[in-house]
From Swiss-Prot:
Keywords: Cytoplasm, Cytoskeleton, Golgi apparatus, Kelch repeat, Repeat, Translation regulation, Ubl conjugation pathway. SMART domains: BACK, BTB, Kelch. This is Kelch repeat and BTB domain-containing protein 8. PROSITE patterns: BTB (PS50097). GO terms for biological process: neural crest cell development; neural crest formation; protein monoubiquitination; regulation of translation. It is found in: Cytoplasm, Cytoskeleton, Spindle; Golgi apparatus. Substrate-specific adapter of a BCR (BTB-CUL3-RBX1) E3 ubiquitin ligase complex that acts as a regulator of neural crest specification. The BCR(KBTBD8) complex acts by mediating monoubiquitination of NOLC1 and TCOF1: monoubiquitination promotes the formation of a NOLC1-TCOF1 complex that acts as a platform to connect RNA polymerase I with enzymes responsible for ribosomal processing and modification, leading to remodel the translational program of differentiating cells in favor of neural crest specification. Residues 7-25 have a biased composition (Polar residues). Component of the BCR(KBTBD8) E3 ubiquitin ligase complex, at least composed of CUL3, KBTBD8 and RBX1. Residues 152-254 form the BACK domain. Pfam families: BACK, BTB, Kelch_1. One of its GO terms (cellular component) is spindle. Kelch repeats lie at residues 334-388, 389-439, 441-479, 481-530, 540-586.
Length: 599
């Protein structure tokens, strides 16, 4: 019997080189991209195309069956079913626009798709017909990122029609968050009964009074009274929390609606126990950025002080532990931060790398949501909301020959979801202040006082303050810009108070803020409960048994513009946190149940 060959050993090949059974499976990472690129070239040049697709208005596209079948179950079924279309050289598709078909084909041959507000819904519809969920998801993501009070209802109705869960949920969340703005839009009146109920029957509705919910239902009803009257009892029963309404308001409800209320749930109950809406729990708080727990080294925290109740909460700290960010609370109570720097691991490093981060705070989840980055990295920029847009102004960077102040200004358009460069300031500024009043932006630093008109993209100069200083504090109060404290040219700290009458273009000296410089105070100016307040960090050094001990107190002072004086109205729990020299304060309405309670 012949001996069997030992297959485990390599045997010579015809060219004498031993072979091995060990497979060497390699992959060219550029192979797929190369094929896609060649297919696109053949599509553009009309080479080897084997099907013509005709869409609305007679527009035709010559393409490849295998490419269409690869991205779309719709086309794969059409070309492999054995029916008439599988052998035809030309197929006609009704209900697809030429632009949408062009975008789908561009995606098929390049994996890229260009979305705009004008094409996104038509493309979503086409992708739904062709069963291409990857395009639908990209369209949904685009629509989510472009939600605003004007389009959110339309997007929600659109998502409901096509059954896209994420788009429907996110648009509904937005509607609840911006409820009072959204209900003023005409599209709100187009909601079906079930869609209206799905929005209103929620604890997360951002209303401070239940009466707003009732009024929105009546407005919706009055748009089509004859068809919608039959639905009122069900809507009232599922959506109105009558125990949260004022008795005097209920007593004034017209008989027509009172009867519907009785049909829905009997007489409105005055008993307690009804869950409050999210907006009813909101409390105006002072937020301190660049603070640190005393027992956690230098790890940053963001305490939120509820002056009315004395409670202290903690906001989610900025991502990447960002410091010296620009901070803005918009008129819609959205909190934004931009720029800043990430702390160095080296204690001696002072030349921090500027960042271009841009984040928005999500109240309901207590987390920061990433937004499009600034065009220019910047530390200590000022954020201002004006004419429906946001502006990032000035700041500093550490580049090239060292520290440089910035002239540059950029503008964020929430509808376009992008930043764009606008006219730079005539002078570079850091440690400056920027405020808005009647569609103009005002920027102050030392001997410079500038104004900016967004409509004209123009900067101009105004009368400078009587005591020029930097690192001061500015806020608009009763049609005047108050500028408080700061550092003069000789590096001396002062607590001067000046008010600029915007209409008269005139500065007026006020009484200085009474402050003992021995306590090394650091001040922040905020508009809290519609009044000017100063948040003061004071440091006191004492000697006990030849040992120096440092203690800090944080106090709040309120300004009486009639008497032109400051009164201490609150002293914070000093054991909870420490504030760095560069701490910043902002005021916003926050929701206690969404925050971590500290005290």
């Amino acid at each position: 019997m012949a001996a069997s060959a030992d297959l485990s050993k390599s045997s010579p090949t015809p060219n004498g080189i031993p072979s091995s059974d060990t497979a060497n499976d390699t992959m060219d990472p550029f192979h797929a991209c190369s094929i896609l690129k060649q297919l696109k070239t053949m599509y553009d040049e009309g080479q080897l195309t084997d099907i013509v697709v005709e869409v609305d208005h007679g527009k035709t596209f010559s393409c490849h069956r295998n490419v269409l079948a690869a991205i779309s179950p719709y086309f794969r079924s059409m070309f492999t079913s054995g029916l008439t279309e599988s052998t035809q050289k030309e197929v006609r598709i009704i209900g697809v626009e030429a632009e949408s078909m062009d975008l789908v084909l561009n995606y098929a041959y390049t994996s890229r798709v260009i979305l705009t507000e004008a094409n996104v819904q038509a493309l979503f519809t086409t992708a739904s017909i062709f069963q291409i969920p990857s395009i639908q998801d990209q369209c949904a993501k685009y629509m989510i990122s472009h939600l605003d009070p004007q389009n959110s209802i339309g997007v929600f109705i659109f998502a409901d029609h096509y059954g896209h869960q994420e788009l429907g949920d996110r648009s509904k969340e937005y509607i609840r968050k911006k409820f009072l703005c959204v209900t003023k839009e005409q599209e709100f009146l187009q909601l079906t009964k079930d869609q209206l109920i799905s929005i209103l029957d929620s604890d997360d509705l951002n209303v401070d009074r239940e009466e707003h919910v009732y009024e929105s239902i009546i407005r919706w009803f009055e748009h089509e009274q004859s068809e919608r009257e039959v639905h009122l009892p069900e809507i009232f029963a599922k959506c109105i929390r009558f125990p949260l309404m004022e008795d005097t308001f209920i007593e004034k409800i017209p008989p027509q609606f009172a009867q519907a209320i009785v049909k829905s749930c009997g007489e409105p109950s005055n008993t307690s126990g009804c869950t409050q809406r999210l907006g009813m729990t909101a409390s105006e708080m002072i937020i301190c950025f660049d603070a640190a727990h005393k027992h956690s080294g230098k790890k940053q925290t963001v305490p939120c002080l509820d002056i009315v109740t004395g409670r202290v909460f903690k906001l989610c700290k900025p991502p990447n532990d960002l410091r010296e960010v620009g901070i803005l609370v918009s008129p819609d109570n959205d909190i934004y931060i931009a720029g800043g720097y990430r702390p160095s691991s080296s204690e001696v490093s002072i030349d921090h790398k500027a960042e271009n981060d841009f984040w928005m705070y999500d109240h309901s989840t207590n987390r920061w949501l990433s937004k499009p980055s600034l065009l220019r990295a910047r530390i200590g920029c000022k954020l201002v909301y004006c004419c429906g847009k946001m502006y990032a102004i000035g700041g500093r960077v550490y580049e090239g020959d060292g520290r440089n102040s910035l002239k540059s200004v950029e503008c964020y358009d929430s509808r376009e979801n992008c930043w764009m460069t606008v006219c730079a300031m005539p002078v570079a500024m850091e440690f400056h202040n920027a405020v808005e009043h009647k569609e103009k932006i005002y920027v102050l630093q030392g001997e410079f006082f500038l104004f900016y008109e967004p409509q004209k993209d123009y900067w101009g100069f105004l009368t400078p303050m009587t005591v020029p200083r930097i690192q001061g504090l500015a806020a608009v109060y009763k049609d005047s810009i108050y500028y408080i404290a700061g550092t003069c040219g000789n590096h001396q700290r002062v607590f001067t108070v000046e008010a600029y009458d915007i209409e008269l273009n005139k500065w007026t000296r006020k009484k200085d803020f009474p402050c003992d410089q021995s306590i090394n105070p650091y001040l922040k100016l905020v508009l809290f409960q519609n009044k000017l307040h100063l948040f003061v960090r004071a440091t006191q050094v004492t000697v006990e048994e030849h040992i120096f001990r440092t203690s800090r107190k944080n106090s709040l002072y309120q300004y009486d513009d009639i008497a032109d004086q400051w009164m201490k109205v609150y002293e914070t729990p000093d054991r909870l946190w420490d504030l760095g020299r560069h701490f910043e304060c902002a005021v916003a309405k926050l929701y206690p149940q969404c925050l971590q309670k500290v005290l």
